[in-house]
Each structure stands twice: as structure tokens, then as C-alpha cells.
Curated annotation (Swiss-Prot):
It is found in: Cell inner membrane. Belongs to the ApbE family. This is FAD:protein FMN transferase. It comes from Chlamydia muridarum (strain MoPn / Nigg). GO terms for cellular component: plasma membrane.
Length: 316
């Protein structure tokens, strides 16, 4: 996860304007899995409360790292990816619950959000960084092992079954948003007003300590967005790009083709999605980048009743 998200492809700024009376708040900041986080509570905590709160924040990130982090070789998801068994694999309650959500995201996105592209994506990145393209035979082999249909969730026994031994999961497209949702649940134990951000995915509740709405700037729109009790996630391709054979490729793969988005065919630069659920917004922002035009993406979002902001190469 660390390497995958490191170039903060989705840089979103929050403007926390200080009132003259220095409104009551407590701030937690740090870096986890190479990604900066910021948590703002609209209450002043005592020293002991702040110490305990920091401990619980660390535990949430440890939880994400130990279960969902593809870059941690000892995580649960990494162990599943290494397994080539076709027998049912027992899942932790946390991973099973999240995979059920992933199943919902995949269906809702009409297959445009596909968490089985990890191995294929790594193959492409390995070659693009070397200014080459993968051999067609190798691409065909990897593509055969992608697709959500190659996984089966048993909702009675809480197990996962691979229908192909080589299929792998990469949950990076939604797990940052999921972590932000978990941090939001934690914050709600202390106060109604809070702001959580991890690497560009944001969740807000109530108001800023000064009494105004939370003011958010997104790379997907020139507008300043004012959020209350909602989340925003942004996906974009303008920060990881490679020039190979007179074409510009990005780090996002089109699940329908298995090929990285190529600038001349995919003009969308950034997408922000607003929703109560940050994991859902995260997944849908990724899905919306795979459309071949801004209008096509907007039409799909309207049909799905999504609140979105999109910018393309025309900066429109």
C-alpha cells in the first residue's frame, strides 16, 4: 500500500482558519505506510485523553497494515495472494466484511472497479518504469487471472475461494477510504465535530471549531467545497505517468482492457466523489477515471445518482 499510494496522486488541502479566540480543538498528525494523516477533533482533550486517543489511532492504522496492506508481506491479504489453493480460505471478520463491501462496489460500478488487477498492474509498472511494454503473451497470461468472477465469497462460512490459483487481490482502490471511515467512527466517540484525512481521502462531521463548514479544495474542481457530515475521495492520473513508444501511460488500469489508461484515449485527469461512505467514494472515484470522456463519466454518475466533480485535459 505504501508504494502504491506514495505519490500523493490525490492532493487535497483543508483550510483550517484560526478564529481570534482560538477555537477549541485537538489535532493529531503523522505518517503511516508513507502516507500523511491528519485528524482534527472539535474538542480540547486533556493530556491523558490525547495520549489514549493517539494510541487508538495507531491501533487503527496497525489494523489496516496487518490485514489489508499488499506491501506488508505478513498481512492477511498478502498471505491470501501467495496461496494457490483452490480450497476455501478462512477470513478474519474484518476482511470478510470488507470484501462483501468490495463485492457491492464492483457490482455498482458495472465492473469498472476491479480489485483483482494488482498482479497485472505490477507487471505493467515494472515494464513502464523501464520504458518498455510487456510482451503480449505475458499480458494474455496475466489477464486470464483477473476478474472478480474468479473469486467466490461464502457468506455462511465467511470464506473466500479462488477459482484460479493465480488470482490476486489489491484493495488499494478503496482501503484508504475504509481507514478514514474507521477513524471517523473513532472520532465520533469524542465529539460531533471532526475532520479526518489520510492521503487525500477525507471524512467530516459537524462543523469546523470556528463554527463554519469544513472547507476543502480538490484537484478535480476549482471550487472550494463546503462539507458537513460527508466524505470526499479523489482519484487521478496526473502524478504517475510514463512516456513509452510515443504514448503517455498512467498507473490506473482499465479493467475492461487490462491496459493502463493512455492519455490520448482517457482525457480525465481527476475525479472527486462525495458520499457518506468514504470507502465507497474512494472506489467510485477510481471507477470514474476509466471513462473515455468527461461527459460519458458525468452521464454514468448521474445515472448512478453520484455527486461528482471531474476535470479533464481541457481543465473544464
Amino acid at each position: 500500500m505504501g508504494k502504491f499510494f506514495t505519490p500523493y496522486a490525490l492532493i487535497i488541502f483543508v483550510f483550517l482558519i484560526q478564529a481570534c479566540s482560538s477555537p477549541s480543538k485537538t489535532i493529531f498528525e503523522g505518517v503511516r505506510m508513507t502516507i500523511p494523516y491528519r485528524v482534527v477533533l472539535g474538542e480540547t482533550l486533556s493530556f491523558s485523553q490525547k495520549k489514549q486517543a493517539q494510541k487508538e489511532i495507531d491501533q487503527i492504522f496497525d489494523h489496516i497494515d496487518q490485514i489489508f496492506n499488499n506491501w506488508n508481506p505478513f498481512s492477511e491479504i498478502s498471505r491470501i495472494n501467495r496461496s494457490e489453493t483452490l480450497e476455501p480460505i478462512s477470513l478474519s471478520p474484518e476482511l470478510f466484511s470488507f470484501l462483501c463491501e468490495i463485492d457491492r462496489f464492483h457490482t455498482f460500478s458495472d465492473g469498472r472497479f476491479d480489485p483483482t488487477l494488482g498482479a497485472l498492474k505490477n507487471l505493467w509498472l515494472l515494464h513502464l518504469k523501464s520504458q518498455t511494454l510487456p510482451p503480449q503473451e505475458l499480458l494474455h497470461s496475466y489477464k486470464q487471472n483477473t476478474g472478480w468472477h474468479l473469486l467466490s465469497l461464502d457468506k455462511t462460512n465467511h470464506t473466500l475461494k479462488k477459482l484460479s490459483p493465480s488470482v490476486q487481490l489489491d484493495l488499494c482502490g478503496a482501503v484508504k477510504g475504509f481507514a478514514v471511515d474507521l477513524l471517523g467512527i473513532f472520532c465520533s466517540q469524542f465529539c460531533q465535530n471532526y475532520y479526518v484525512e489520510w492521503g487525500g481521502e477525507i471524512k467530516t462531521s459537524g462543523k469546523h471549531p470556528s463554527g463554519r463548514s469544513w472547507a476543502i479544495a480538490s484537484s478535480a474542481t476549482p471550487e472550494i467545497l463546503h462539507l458537513n457530515n460527508s466524505s470526499i475521495a479523489t482519484s487521478g492520473n496526473q502524478y504517475q505517468r510514463w512516456y513509452v513508444n510515443k504514448k503517455i501511460y498512467t498507473h490506473i488500469l482499465d479493467p475492461l482492457t487490462g491496459i493502463p489508461l493512455e492519455e490520448s484515449s482517457y482525457p480525465i485527469l481527476a475525479v472527486s466523489v462525495i458520499d457518506e461512505n468514504c470507502a465507497f467514494a474512494d472506489a467510485m472515484a477510481t471507477a470514474l477515471t476509466t471513462f473515455t470522456s468527461k461527459q460519458e463519466a458525468l452521464d454514468w454518475a448521474k445515472k448512478k445518482h453520484l455527486c461528482v466533480y471531474i476535470t479533464d485535459k481541457n481543465a473544464s
